[in-house]
């Protein structure tokens, strides 16, 4: 392969693009030309109008010739694009940009050193009925030993689907640019090359297993297919959510069987003829506390009938969780407290406050 400096000065291997879409960056242009061969340099230069200028230099004359074979009257046409391409073979090499980015240099440069990455877990909306699927369990240190936790995946949500699909499209483009071979620490996150053109975000959960944090599946760990996750893909939380069943108190005898119970619950979700639904009632630390049901079948009630736990529905519990929207609505309603100068009214108010304090002490709140 030619060196990056050779590629820069290689005669008759450069192209000038006059109408790069304004929303494109270097990598968009790179992926158009890498179909025809090895790209040495690729640069998009912003312009004040709706289009940008682009500069591409292929790594060999043969690679450049493949580009020329696909030009039609100076146009490179493909899915959803039509680029006006000037061939440096015809106009000379003087237009080669000195500020071009070396793709080969980017590919060969080691990633910036940083600490291990841990993606944030996905929060579910309060008091909202959503469609979900119970997926493979993602172990977490967030759950106490006596808390029965599940991992669920939100489904049939167009807005969420669009966000994650867009992220994975960018990740799959990134997969073409880096060499994968990194040691992931157990309990931390990275990306996994599933196929030559597809990567997925993962967490290493054991010496031999990875967890697909956006799909809810466990796969085998292969060091040669792993890479530290780029910072740009760390901002979106995992698509799976860590959940507990609200209102359940478990017997000591049931706790060692949590793994088996999780398997039964996952099969229950898969066997139901209708879609599972979840409503988040509140939060316990980093855990979404949910009611999980399918039609008239409520999971917590089914487990209670097995005699392995006690179930206290949310409306019977002493504490309540209110949604952020409800609190904002109340705050914005313009209701303000008026201070009274009447001594008797103030004394009565203080008595009520003392009564509330006593009640809270009795409830150990």
Swiss-Prot record:
Q: Name one GO molecular function term.
A: mRNA binding
Q: Spell out the InterPro entries in the cross-references.
A: Nucleotide-bd_a/b_plait_sf, RBD_domain_sf, RRM_dom
* Residue intervals of the RRM domain: 13-90
GO CC, alphabetical:
cytoplasm; nucleus; perinuclear region of cytoplasm; ribonucleoprotein complex; RNA cap binding complex
Which GO BP annotation is one of this protein's?
A: positive regulation of cell division
**Record's keyword terms, sorted:** Cell cycle, Cell division, Developmental protein, RNA-binding
Q: Which CDD domains match?
A: RRM_SF
The name on file for this protein is Embryonic developmental protein tofu-6
Q: What species does this protein belong to? A: Caenorhabditis briggsae
């Amino acid at each position: 392969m030619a060196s990056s400096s050779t590629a820069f000065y290689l005669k008759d291997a450069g192209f000038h693009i006059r109408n790069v879409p304004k929303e494109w960056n270097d990598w968009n242009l790179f992926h158009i030309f890498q179909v025809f061969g090895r790209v040495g340099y690729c640069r998009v230069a912003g312009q004040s109008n709706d289009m940008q200028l682009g500069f591409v230099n292929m790594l060999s004359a043969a690679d450049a010739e493949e580009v020329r074979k696909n030009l039609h009257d100076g146009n490179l046409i493909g899915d959803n694009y039509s680029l006006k391409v000037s061939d440096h073979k015809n106009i000379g090499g003087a237009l080669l940009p000195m500020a071009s980015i070396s793709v080969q240099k980017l590919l060969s440069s080691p990633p910036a050193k940083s600490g291990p990455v841990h993606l944030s877990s996905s929060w579910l909306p309060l008091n909202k009925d959503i469609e979900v699927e119970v997926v493979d369990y993602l172990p977490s240190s967030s759950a106490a030993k006596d808390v029965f936790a599940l991992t669920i995946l939100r489904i049939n949500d167009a807005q969420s689907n669009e966000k994650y699909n867009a992220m994975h499209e960018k990740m799959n483009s990134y997969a073409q640019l880096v060499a994968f071979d990194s040691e992931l620490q157990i309990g931390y996150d990275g990306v996994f090359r599933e196929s030559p053109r597809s990567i997925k975000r993962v967490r290493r959960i054991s010496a031999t297993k990875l967890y697909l944090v956006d799909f809810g599946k466990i796969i085998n760990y292969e060091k040669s297919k792993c890479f530290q996750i780029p910072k740009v893909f760390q901002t979106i939380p995992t698509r799976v959510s860590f959940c507990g069943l609200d209102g359940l108190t478990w017997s000591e005898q049931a706790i060692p069987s949590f793994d088996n119970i999780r398997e039964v619950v996952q099969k229950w979700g898969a066997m139901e003829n209708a879609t599972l639904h979840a409503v988040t009632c509140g939060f316990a630390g980093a855990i979404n506390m949910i009611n999980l049901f399918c039609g008239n079948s409520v999971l917590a009630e089914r487990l209670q009938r097995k005699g392995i736990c006690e179930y206290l529905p949310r409306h019977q519990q002493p504490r309540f969780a209110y949604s952020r929207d409800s609190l904002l609505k109340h705050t914005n309603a313009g209701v303000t407290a008026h201070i009274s100068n009447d001594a008797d009214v103030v004394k009565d108010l203080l008595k009520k406050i003392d009564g509330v304090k006593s009640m809270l002490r009795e409830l150990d709140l």
